[in-house]
Amino acid sequence: MRKTIFTLVLALTALTAAAQQRYLLRFNPVLNQVLHYRTQINMTIDVPQVGPMQMQTTIEQDQEAQNMSDRNYIVSTTFTAIDGVMTPTVGTGPSAKGQSINLRDMEPIKALINKPFIMRYNDLRKPEGPLMAETKAMGIDPSMQKMLNSATLPAAFPERPVAVGENWTATMEVQGLASEITFRLVEVTPEAYVVTYDGLMRGTVTETQPGMAVNIDGNISGRTYYSRTTGWEIPGQNNAKITMSMSVPGVMEGMRMQMEVQQ
């Protein structure tokens, strides 16, 4: 009897220790190693007086950490292919005829292909913003440069070690669009930290076009598998969903968008 009780105590102790084990998630990429990602996006946009439109997009991109100093990494992202079609499904006017728009034929899309986009990340996977010289060299519109460089994007990883089932929060703000995102470590495998996230996105974006303000109310959620050794996303296992409503006072009300992402 005493042996049985002792065995149970040991088992409970082991389970408690496992439940309390904490993990330090960090971005520690191998320098000059190129990772290839294929992202598929399915989007539905419902525009008042026009009707819903659907868009399927495939993005091929390479990512590479090229330099490191004081826990900061210079990461190059190169879009090698962007292909997709936007198709109106119902509505009135020209869109009702069902003409499809091929994204790869659009000049702004062509301008992105095979031109490295440089970002700085710290070891929490927090983007510090693009390097201004690089955005200028790419010919990015000045208003877009300002938006990219003023963006406050969330860190993917917490500052402290966390246990499975533990939450942490991060904030994001881009040109008036603010959100607080709750992350949760839901599983640890031999290869990956599995993290889910969910958050609201609300605000008024004022610099899309001169004199135009866009009110946005939405939600973002998803699941990401991060490599335990490098902190990179593990290709082929990640998903996200974004839903939002948008309105331009005096111009358009009730526009809705839903986006599903697989990477």
Per-region residue spans from a language model:
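Hydrophobic h-region of N-terminal signal peptides that target proteins for export
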Residues: 10-18
